[in-house]
From Swiss-Prot:
Swiss-Prot/TrEMBL keywords: DNA-binding, Nucleus, Transcription, Transcription regulation
Any Pfam family hit: B3
Protein name per its UniProtKB record: B3 domain-containing protein At4g01580
Segments crossing the lipid bilayer: none
Organism for this UniProt entry: Arabidopsis thaliana (Mouse-ear cress)
Biased composition (Polar residues): 12-23
InterPro entries with a match to the protein in the record: B3_DNA-bd, DNA-bd_pseudobarrel_sf, Plant_B3_domain
Annotated compartments: Nucleus
Residue spans binding DNA: 29-122
Keyword Nucleus: yes
Disulfide bonds: none
Length: 190
C-alpha cells in the first residue's frame, strides 16, 4: 500500500484531535504568573486547557505540596467552566511570600494533589528553609510549625532578600565604624 501525503496529513490530524480529547491526557503540568488580580482577589485560576483535560478528576479540596514538604489544603471554587484555587490560597501565598511577578509551576500528582515550584522575581527557584521544620496541617486551618532553626532564624518572617539586604547594611555599618576608628587614630597621632 502506498501512503500519500494527504493520507498521512489526515492520519496526523485525526490522531492529534483524539489526543486532545483523551481523558488520560499527558497534560499534568501548568504554570501561572502571579498577577495583581491574583493577589487582590485572593484566588488563582487554573488554566482552561488543564481544567478541560483534568478538571473532572479534581475533588472539592486539593493539596498543594512544595519541594520542602509544606502541604496546604486548598478549596476549589467552580465558576461556570472555570476552576480557581480559593479558600486557603491566600494563606499558602502568604506563607511562601508569593508576590506579583512570581512564577509558579504546578504538577498534578493524582488524588487531587499538586507539586508546586515557586520562582521569584529573579527567575530562580525559591528555596524555603523548611527542611528542618515540622509542619502539621489540620482540619481547623491552624498550622503548627516547630523546629529550633525556624524559631530562632525565622520569627521575623523576613523574606530571603530582606535578610541578605540586612547583612549588607550590617557590613556597611561595620566598615564605616572601622573607617572612623582609623581616622580617629590618625588624628591622635598627627
Amino acid at each position: 500500500m502506498v501512503i500519500t501525503r494527504n493520507m498521512k496529513a489526515r492520519a496526523t490530524s485525526v490522531s492529534h484531535r483524539q489526543s486532545q480529547q483523551d481523558p488520560e491526557s499527558p497534560v499534568k503540568k501548568f504554570f501561572k504568573l502571579v498577577l495583581p488580580s491574583t493577589m487582590k482577589d485572593k484566588m488563582m485560576r487554573i488554566p482552561p486547557r488543564f481544567v478541560k483535560l483534568q478538571g473532572s478528576k479534581l475533588s472539592e479540596v486539593v493539596t498543594l505540596v512544595t519541594p520542602a514538604g509544606y502541604k496546604r489544603s486548598i478549596k476549589l471554587k467552580r465558576i461556570g467552566e472555570e476552576i480557581w484555587f480559593h479558600e486557603g490560597w491566600s494563606e499558602f501565598a502568604e506563607a511562601h511570600s508569593i508576590e506579583e511577578g512570581h512564577f509558579l509551576l504546578f504538577e498534578y500528582k493524582k488524588n487531587s494533589s499538586f507539586r508546586v515550584i515557586i520562582f521569584n522575581a529573579s527567575a530562580c527557584e525559591t528555596n524555603y528553609p523548611l527542611d528542618a521544620v515540622h509542619i502539621i496541617d489540620s482540619d481547623d486551618d491552624v498550622i503548627e510549625i516547630t523546629g529550633k532553626e525556624f524559631d530562632t532564624e525565622h520569627k521575623s518572617k523576613k523574606r530571603p532578600r530582606d535578610i541578605e539586604f540586612d547583612k549588607i547594611l550590617h557590613d556597611v555599618d561595620v566598615m564605616q565604624v572601622l573607617k572612623e576608628e582609623e581616622e580617629d587614630k590618625r588624628v591622635l597621632r598627627g
